Swiss-Prot record:
InterPro entries: FN3_dom, FN3_sf, Ig-like_fold, Phgtail_TP901_1. It comes from Bacillus phage SPP1. GO terms for biological process: symbiont genome ejection through host cell envelope, long flexible tail mechanism; viral head-tail joining; viral translational frameshifting. The tail tube is formed by the proteins gp17.1 and gp17.1* at a ratio of about 3:1. The lineage of its organism: Viruses, Duplodnaviria, Heunggongvirae, Uroviricota, Caudoviricetes. Homohexamer. Self-assembles into a long sixfold helical tube. SPP1 virion tails are composed of about 40 stacked rings, and each tail ring is rotated by about 21 degrees relative to the previous one. Interacts with the tail completion protein gp17. This is Tail tube protein gp17.1*.
Length: 264
């Protein structure tokens, strides 16, 4: 097979909230158009009576990703939540063509989103650009497996199949899940546990704290405990179901912690 250059179309930028449950798949923000990573190494450079001393210092890595906005997209929402709340986010640059080990070459880092820009022209889609500053430096490695809809997204989210190989719709056309129903809660003096019915087709659930809808956790179960609340305090909790198609509309419940026990 003749050697070919790495094509930009094959390189995908994946993200994951630091609150995502262990074992969760990475998120591929929709409609990516451009991406880049860059690194700069500081050099120790001094002149001495014995001549010039030159040596390597620390490395500062950064990244930029541009994409068109999509309502309800889970990957884009994870980025926005990390930016709004000043949280770290996990970040991968992945070559989606398998290497000689039958795996995917990748770079990984924890990062902060330094800037986010919306371009809202009269014509065309809304363009969103983000810049990231990596904590430490990017780590090189290999990803064992990736969801088919990420690998084959440029082909419509799927590759050739044999008759009867799978069931369901094309991976790239997964409909949004329904909103969680029948939210209930139990309370202590400093926490509330919210429960809801399972949503068909949901891979996980985002739980948001307060009126500002700050992401508290991404969970794969149908309950979550929110802690660190003052006694006798109301707290609005929103829950949304998530799958490969994006995030569902939110369902809301107003909770209240128990009063503090009297010490008199």
């Amino acid at each position: 097979m003749p050697e070919t250059p790495i094509m930009g179309q094959d390189v995908k930028y994946l993200f994951q909230s630091i609150d995502a449950a262990t074992g969760s798949a990475p998120l591929f923000p929709a409609y990516q158009t451009d991406g880049s990573v860059s690194g700069e190494r500081e050099l120790f450079d001094e002149q001495t009576k014995n001549g010039r001393i030159l040596g390597p210092g620390s490395v500062a890595d950064s990244g930029e990703v541009t994409y068109y906005g999509k309502r309800g997209d889970a990957g884009q929402k994870a980025i926005e939540d990390a930016y709004q709340n000043g949280k770290q986010i996990k970040f991968w640059r992945v070559d989606t063509v398998k290497n000689e080990n039958d795996k995917y070459d990748a770079q990984f880092g924890f990062a902060y989103i330094e800037s986010r820009e919306y371009s809202d022209g009269v014509e065309g889609a809304v363009e969103i650009s983000i810049s990231l500053q990596v904590i430490g430096e990017l780590k090189n490695g290999e990803i064992d497996t990736l969801p088919e809809e990420i690998v084959n997204v440029s082909k419509g989210g799927y590759d050739f199949q044999q008759p009867g190989q799978t069931t369901g719709e094309a991976p790239g056309t997964v409909p949004l899940p329904n909103a969680p129903q029948n939210l209930t809660y139990t309370a202590t003096t400093d926490s509330v546990t919210v429960k809801w019915d399972a949503v068909e087709g949901a891979d996980s659930y985002n739980v948001y704290r307060g009126a500002e809808k700050k992401l508290d956790a991404n969970v794969t179960t149908t309950s979550h405990t929110l802690t660190g609340i003052q006694p006798d305090t109301q707290l609005t909790v929103n829950v949304a179901a998530v799958n490969a198609g994006g995030e569902s509309p939110m369902s809301q419940i107003v909770t209240k912690t128990l009063p503090a026990e009297s010490t008199g």
